Amino acid sequence: MAHYNFKKITVVPSAKDFIDLTLSKTQRKTPTVIHKHYQIHRIRHFYMRKVKFTQQNYHDRLSQILSDFPKLDDIHPFYADLMNILYDKDHYKLALGQINIAKNLVDNVAKDYVRLMKYGDSLYRCKQLKRAALGRMCTIIKRQRQSLEYLEQVRQHLSRLPTIDPNTRTLLLCGYPNVGKSSFINKVTRADVDVQPYAFTTKSLFVGHVDYKYLRWQVVDTPGILDHPLEDRNTIEMQAITALAHLRAAVLYVMDLSEQCGHGLKEQLGLFQNIRPLFINKPLIVVASKCEVKRIAELSEEDQKIFLDLQAEGFPVIETSTLTEEGVIQVKTEACDRLLAHRVETKMKGNKVNEVLNRLHLAVPNKRDDKERPPFIPEGVVARRKRMEIAEPKKKRERDLELEMGDDYILDLQKYWDLMNSSEKYDKIPEIWEGHNAADYIDPAIMKKLEELEKGKKSSEQLLGSMPVSLRVKTRKWWKIRQLAKQIREKKKLKILQSKEKNTQGPRMPRTAKKVQRADLENEMRSLGVDMDDKDNAHYAVRARRSRSVTRKRKREESVPPSSIARSRSRSCSKTPRDVSGLRDVKMVKKAKTMMKKAQKKMNRLGKKGEADRHVFDMKPKHLLSGKRKAGKKERR
């Protein structure tokens, strides 16, 4: 909505939910532990804080409700009357008044009990005062159950109301039920209003939007109105009356020519005269709908006189059919133009126009001489205007040709090219290509030269066949030399690429650190021309075998009792401690120990027994969360 967004009103909880939400928030967001041996001012402050916190929560929520709901005296009269019809203005104001009184009562209760708590001389008395304060607040809210439920229903209905801007350009449809109002709005706009062959299908206001002359227009579909006194009209009809009374719109009064709506033309004219005071200062158009069934010319003279009288009074009558879409666009155009003119006329009568006109200055140049200077209109424009007046047959488009020719049609856009030489339209090579003249790069005798070249090739082959054997052998040797030279060039290119790969800027591994495989070494030597057969006893093969232990383990010697203390003992093999194995020097050992301590910090902080301790403690103890919370069992709050 331009000014009113009723969809943003916060949800109004029920009285029970209201109490539960507030008390739960108090329990969660205030301290919960107090002991009787604490100083008395600390105990008082503990319970005062709970009372004030609860009071503030109630105050904020109730204030939010009061501020979100629209005040009937501050909003547009259209919405004020619409809410009065839908929700009863007195009931609505009474509910908001009750909420406001409840808010003040909660504030007064909190103030009184905080004053009494200042004189509490023990933990028990302060606690009882706190319980009494929270209990009285909850009782006050509990008594507002009906008001809260009513306001929640109003909120839900308000959020479903259509988005109507009372101040923008509007087309308003009205008339008897089932005369074709909803069908018209479905044709003109993208609204999807339900259309059924019975009366009062539309029970509330519906809105669609349409563009005309680069402006945004809203089309409002109203429920049907019956011809009886205002006091007897129901809520559905009063919505249409409210829209007619307050929206500055162009009114489209829809009349059913076929009388299939169940009401004759005289009854429809009677309704028109009944609600005519609502059409004052509004552009009005009479829409004669369902003309595909019966037209005005086919009516009786008495019925035709109805429309003639309306036209005599200055109301345009337009025949329409939503089935064949006849007259629909005409009605929209006529209504929009009349409303635009009416709005301009209204603004010109106001005081703001004079303020704007005083700021404008129209500069007119002085006349230089008596020579006439008529506007110049090219001859082509004049000729085109004449052709348009004659209404000569239109030029056939490619789409029309495609429909005529069917499968024989081929899209040819080159026939429309405007070239100096029309014979160049279908040239395969264009005259200009990317800024260059293509003819400059083409030899006209190229095909002739190609034929001569092919002839020369054939003659050379014939010449080779007619050569003596000695010359042919020399030619073959020359051919082999060329093949070898080609292989050498390719080898050089590979070497260059390998050299480029070696010349990278990344980290390099020294040659001595690289592990050389025996097979790779033998392949490389063979490629250089070295015979690598029967090399099992060569130095590189023996060294490779020595690198891994091939000797058998020494047999364990028989244990002999010690003959003397002084006998020689062999020194046991020394073993590196585990905490320093794999570490280079003392500096690295210190760094490893520091990292180990950091890794153990989190485990120690969580009180884990070790790395394998994955125990998860019970986050929801059963003795606190099991069982039902019935009335009188909520002491822990």
Curated annotation (Swiss-Prot):
Gene: Gtpbp4
Family: Belongs to the TRAFAC class OBG-HflX-like GTPase superfamily. OBG GTPase family. NOG subfamily.
A biological process term (GO) from this entry: negative regulation of cell migration
Cellular localisation: Nucleus, Nucleolus
Protein name: GTP-binding protein 4
Domain OBG-type G: 169-340
Keyword entries, A-Z: Acetylation, GTP-binding, Isopeptide bond, Nucleotide-binding, Nucleus, Phosphoprotein, Ribosome biogenesis, Ubl conjugation
Listed GO CC annotations: cytoplasm; nucleolus; nucleus; perinuclear region of cytoplasm
Complex formation: Associates with pre-60S ribosomal particles. Interacts with MINAS-60 (product of an alternative open reading frame of RBM10).
Coiled-coil regions listed: none
Biased composition (Basic and acidic residues): 576-588, 608-621
GO molecular function, one term: GTPase activity
Low complexity bias locations: 563-574
Residues modified to N-acetylalanine: A2
Zinc is among the record's keywords: no
N6-acetyllysine modified-residue sites: K103
Cross-referenced InterPro entries: G_OBG (IPR031167), GTP-bd (IPR006073), NOG1 (IPR024926), NOG1_N (IPR041623), NOG1_Rossman_fold_dom (IPR010674), NOG_C (IPR012973), P-loop_NTPase (IPR027417)
Role noted for this protein: Involved in the biogenesis of the 60S ribosomal subunit. Acts as TP53 repressor, preventing TP53 stabilization and cell cycle arrest.
Feature: compositional bias, Basic residues: 542-555, 589-607, 622-637
Binding site for GTP: 175-182, 221-225, 289-292
Organism: Rattus norvegicus (Rat)
PANTHER family on file: NUCLEOLAR GTP-BINDING PROTEIN 1
UniProt crosslink position (Glycyl lysine isopeptide (Lys-Gly) (interchain with G-Cter in SUMO2)): K103, K332, K535
UniProt cross-references to PROSITE patterns, sorted A to Z: G_OBG
Main location: nucleus
